[in-house]
């Protein structure tokens, strides 16, 4: 299977992710699952930079006649976040050809993965939840919804919600991401959820949120993730207005270390913004993976809908030139600019004007900024992702070598040997002084407990449950 060939190619209309208009793209579907789009028909198959590049492996396909006839949607789970891409073609026959070709490639890749796992000595990976239990608990009881108090809605989106919870037994706080099963079960295609939850379990880095448990109910999949209590970086920055360059260097280095780790695993984080950065009790960074928008934002003037925070969008995302790792370095540039300058590099309440600034405007700096800081931010905020600092083949190493980070020992960063410039005033992991008071005092009801048996699993769950074998997971053996 080393020879990757083209299965199907042709013109399709792709709907913009942020600015919801349709753009013509020439797409190639390949045997390795890559589905790549260009503005022009490529004369040379190995054009270096496709505008759109995603994989149809483990995807779900849906057909719809809205917002245009002959539309099809590709949906897949990236970590615990559901992402969708929308396309349309001129005729039902054309749509049928594309969807059949995509499904055939996805099915073949799935069979190959199953064969690999069956041959592999580590095929017990499916039992990862059981394997990785704390050896001291011989009769481990699976986690259920009844094991947690539900405190506050942290985020909400089309596919589910994220709730701050407290584990009753330990008093520890977690973020529980709850996805509706019906949006991720299409026919029998659920392998992607299982595979992605495995990726999350295997993702271990000191500055990334880790997965503590996962389990399922009748109609939901639940991911229970670390939630640190040193407060959001946004909260600390609002209180102090700006951070010193030294303090920013410390946080920036930890973020670079985490993104380097993700990129080495072929994962683009794509959602770096101040609100997704938290501090642990010692003052180290934690990048969250709660992955839900704070609801769609509608611009009344244009009726175009945005998901998330448009101020952080990279130029290539806005132009719908699908993006690679360099999108994360733009995000790093925006958050480090905010830390050192006390404001966003580009801002306008009117989204159309904001997008124009992001795409066209030169960046301005306060006079107080050092030349190294200006050089770093200028490099990270270059509009063209291929010329951006970190946009080359060396990725994070390019940023690590920049003079702003000279003197930083990157192994010490990873090992948490550097002393944090600020230590949150918390006494333990359950100290809630940086949480909103309104929700530490009360709980919220998510599901009427009587709907579940004592195991937290609905008795009527028989026909839905087999879709998600071995979904339960506990990380207690890995700490």
From Swiss-Prot:
Changing residue 305 to A: No activation after pervanadate treatment. Residues 5-107 form the PH domain. Residues 148-405 form the Protein kinase domain. Gene3D superfamilies: Phosphorylase Kinase, domain 1 (3.30.200.20), Pleckstrin-homology domain (PH domain)/Phosphotyrosine-binding domain (PTB) (2.30.29.30), Transferase(Phosphotransferase) domain 1 (1.10.510.10). Residues 458-479 are annotated as: Disordered. Keywords: Acetylation, ATP-binding, Cytoplasm, Disease variant, Disulfide bond, Glycoprotein, Kinase, Membrane, Nucleotide-binding, Nucleus, Phosphoprotein, Serine/threonine-protein kinase, Transferase, Ubl conjugation. In adult tissues, it is highly expressed in brain, lung and kidney, but weakly in heart, testis and liver. In fetal tissues, it is highly expressed in heart, liver and brain and not at all in kidney. The keyword Cell membrane does not apply. GO terms for molecular function: ATP binding; protein kinase activity; protein serine kinase activity; protein serine/threonine kinase activity. GO terms for cellular component: ciliary basal body; cilium; cytosol; Golgi apparatus; nucleoplasm; plasma membrane. It is a peripheral membrane protein. Its EC number is 2.7.11.1. Interacts (via PH domain) with TCL1A; this enhances AKT3 phosphorylation and activation. Interacts with TRAF6. Interacts with KCTD20. Interacts with BTBD10. It is linked to AKT3 is a key modulator of several tumors like melanoma, glioma and ovarian cancer. Active AKT3 increases progressively during melanoma tumor progression with highest levels present in advanced-stage metastatic melanomas. Promotes melanoma tumorigenesis by decreasing apoptosis. Plays a key role in the genesis of ovarian cancers through modulation of G2/M phase transition. With AKT2, plays a pivotal role in the biology of glioblastoma. Megalencephaly-polymicrogyria-polydactyly-hydrocephalus syndrome 2: A syndrome characterized by megalencephaly, hydrocephalus, and polymicrogyria; polydactyly may also be seen. There is considerable phenotypic similarity between this disorder and the megalencephaly-capillary malformation syndrome. This is RAC-gamma serine/threonine-protein kinase. It comes from Homo sapiens.
